Amino acid sequence: MQLTQLLALALSLATSEAAYKGFNYGDKKPDGSSKYQADFASEFETAQNLVGAPGFTSARLYTMIQAGTANDPISAIPAAIAQNTSLLLGLWASGNNMNNELTALKAAISQYGEDLSKLVVGISVGSEDLYRNSVLGQKVNAGVGVDPHVLASYIEEVRSTISGTPLSGAPLGHVDTWNDWVNGSNAAVIDAVDWVGFDGYPYFQNTMANSIDDAKALFNEAVAKTKSAAGNKEVWITETGWPVSGKTENLAVASIPNAKRFWDEVGCPLFDNTNTWWYTLQDAFGASVPNPSFGIVGSTLTTQPLFDLSCSKSNTTSSSAIASPTSTAAAAGGVAGGSTGSASGSSTGTGSSSGSGSNSNTGAASGAVGAADRETSGTSGSANTNGTSGSGSGSNSTSGHGSNVTVPTRPTSVSNVSPSKSSSALFTGAATSMGASPSSVGNVGPSKSSGAASPSSTTMFTGAATSVSAPVVHVVLLALMMVIAA
């Protein structure tokens, strides 16, 4: 075998082993004020340099719109380009705001072109819209959602919009709570996407035994059911986390020790194997502290986290429901951006698990829905606020990005821009983060779902891998040894 062939093989395997890891970022600060480029840059730089956790070089956004404007591109984009942070872009699909989101998307492509395309992992069309559209979401006044067939049409509209542009190969997806993915009435969305975004928070599954002792099993079961419903579509972990402070949800106690344990038992097995965006880096600022608060750095933006983020080899291989290394983003173009991740645990975690979770649950029974209620984002400069969705059971989140939309809050209020979670709901879904304060309710926040969009032939889409697992190194070394032996 020729050297070039061996290296190509090694590179392809390395690409398939790469996984993106990062945090969710809303368009507003915890106090409700708008974020600008310098704010995003500070957050991205902090995430990349967290003590004990190198490689968090990806950012999930909920909207394409800069807070305080009608449809200007969000300033997180130039910040990401400057910081070499990969992006899971999001368009807020609820509240009749898609036209403005598409305008902002087109403007971003025109303005940033290849610099943007090299960093885009995927594009999420909507965030927890199905949850807010569900019987359960309506019961808790989670905010305006979107019918699955309308959402599927939005996904195709985005696919058409990026065709022939530098983002033409970006995989498209949708982010929602796991119980809505297993609801058969939402199958049209699964058919339309390239990947499925999973939001899940055992903390909010307050109709079940949901202590920290139960968290890992609840999470793995939810992932397994989502994977079963998704069929051959990849499942990306777009929101999960455990609060460092706040009220108790049934048996779930918010505390730093419990947040650390959830990170170890759920996060570490994911980080080098599955595209994962944690909730969250920071959701508190000074006196503005949401209840519950999920931020791992507390109320001051610092590289020193509230608990040890290092992952031991043992806890990087402990989760049985973790998906195998992602290939959707790699297929779309791979390892372009900054592969900075550490190769800490190879971990397999195939996560087969059955959990077919037939298609009928709307989520009330299992308490897995409602992430949308925990986050809130204040209003953003313009007339409306966008809300992000959240999937956990908690109901207190809303965030708004400030265009002309209103944002609902989780089981209670869902906002879209920044991930602050206030909980008052009884489900377990995934929280979304868009706005800053956990109190505003709106229905427009941007969400992220990305899929492996059919590679449209005009441009090359390159993603930015953030971590490469140990097997890749072995493959490369083996290839070199074979060359030497030959």
UniProtKB/Swiss-Prot annotation:
The lipid modification GPI-anchor amidated glycine is placed on 463
Ranges of Low complexity compositional bias?
A: 341-404, 413-424, 445-458
Any stretches that span the bilayer, and where are they?
Answer: none
For membrane topology, the record states: Lipid-anchor; GPI-anchor
- GO biological process entries: cell wall organization; polysaccharide catabolic process
Q: Which UniProt keywords apply?
A: Carbohydrate metabolism, Cell membrane, Cell wall, Cell wall biogenesis/degradation, Glycoprotein, GPI-anchor, Hydrolase, Lipoprotein, Membrane, Polysaccharide degradation, Secreted, Signal
Write down the chemical reaction(s) this protein catalyses. Hydrolysis of (1->3)-beta-D-glucosidic linkages in (1->3)-beta-D-glucans
Its Enzyme Commission number(s) read: 3.2.1.39
Does this UniProt record's set of keywords contain Cell wall biogenesis/degradation?
yes
- Annotated active site residues, numbered on this chain, are 128, 239
The residues that carry sugar chains are 84, 183, 315, 386, 396, 404
A single cellular component GO annotation: extracellular region
Query: Which residues constitute the signal peptide according to the record?
Result: 1-18
User: Sorted alphabetically, which SUPFAM superfamilies does this protein's record hold?
Assistant: (Trans)glycosidases
Prosegment residue ranges? 464-486
Segment Disordered: which positions?
A: 330-458
Q: Does the keyword Cell cycle apply?
A: no
Family, according to the entry, reads as follows:
Belongs to the glycosyl hydrolase 17 family.
Record function comment: Glucanases play a role in cell expansion during growth, in cell-cell fusion during mating, and in spore release during sporulation. This enzyme may be involved in beta-glucan degradation and also function biosynthetically as a transglycosylase.
Q: What name does the UniProt record give this protein?
A: Probable glucan endo-1,3-beta-glucosidase eglC
Give the species: Aspergillus terreus (strain NIH 2624 / FGSC A1156)
The lineage is: Eukaryota, Fungi, Dikarya, Ascomycota, Pezizomycotina
